[in-house]
A protein has these predicted regions:
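A short alpha/beta connector and helix-capping loop motif
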Residues: 23-50
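N-terminal nucleotide-binding beta1-loop-alpha1 segment
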Residues: 9-14
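Early exported N-terminus immediately downstream of N-terminal targeting peptides
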Residues: 43-59, 65
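Short acidic, Gly/Ser-rich segments with clustered Asp/Glu that frequently serve as metal-coordination loops
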Residues: 16-19
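Short, basic, glycine/proline-bearing loop/turn elements
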Residues: 21-23, 109
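Short glycine-rich, polar/acidic loop-and-turn segments at beta strand-coil junctions
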Residues: 34, 52-55, 88
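Active-site-adjacent betaalpha module
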Residues: 1-7, 61-181
């Protein structure tokens, strides 16, 4: 078990969302940035957590559904990485995430993934309540346009809204797992 003050949490980068019927904002760039974070975390011996969002057993997002499987480009290391299932927007609700982080001595959670206005937002707001300093990688989370706002507006809004009271913002290229202790 890797012990570290930092952990990387990649949220819901799964087939049915990332490769869904609606285009994501800057999906190629976001994926490259997430892969950079994963590589840097592994080099720094920082634990990497992957959340998979599932729905009811009779839904298209059941646990066994191909739609809930993580995208292969993440190169999940089954022997080292921690993959967990969640049913709610918060990665902490009814999961063992807090226990797993605490067992590894994690004090700071670095967050990336999707969707910005749902699970990324909720987890960023919940993490400090669970005692974690939180870093949101501003160019490593994404969503899609909705009826009222473009995806870029949603992302920009959340970066501004979450910064300060809930998270520290950083970019993937500027973030170093070695620099924060």
């Amino acid at each position: 078990m890797l012990l570290s003050e930092n952990a990387l949490l990649v949220i819901d980068m799964q087939q049915g969302l990332f490769r869904g019927p609606t285009s994501l904002h800057s999906s190629d760039t976001v994926l490259l940035n997430i892969r950079l974070l994963i590589e840097n975390a592994r080099q720094a011996q920082v634990p990497v957590f992957f959340a998979r969002h599932i729905g009811p057993d009779d839904s298209p997002f059941s646990k066994q559904s191909p739609l809930t499987q993580l995208i292969p480009e993440l190169n999940v290391n089954a022997e080292q990485d921690i993959v967990f299932i969640k049913k709610y927007p918060s990665c902490f609700r009814d999961t063992e995430l807090q226990l797993q982080l605490s067992q590894r001595g994690v004090k700071q959670l670095v967050i990336a993934g999707m969707k910005t206005e749902f699970c990324v937002d909720t987890t960023c707001r919940a993490a400090p309540e669970h005692g974690f300093r939180t870093v949101l990688i501003s160019d490593a989370h994404t969503t899609m346009d909705n009826k009222y706002l473009s995806a870029s507006e949603i992302i920009a809004h959340h970066n501004v809204t979450l910064a300060g009271p809930f998270v520290t913002l950083a970019t993937a290229a500027c973030w170093s797992f070695h620099s924060e202790k």
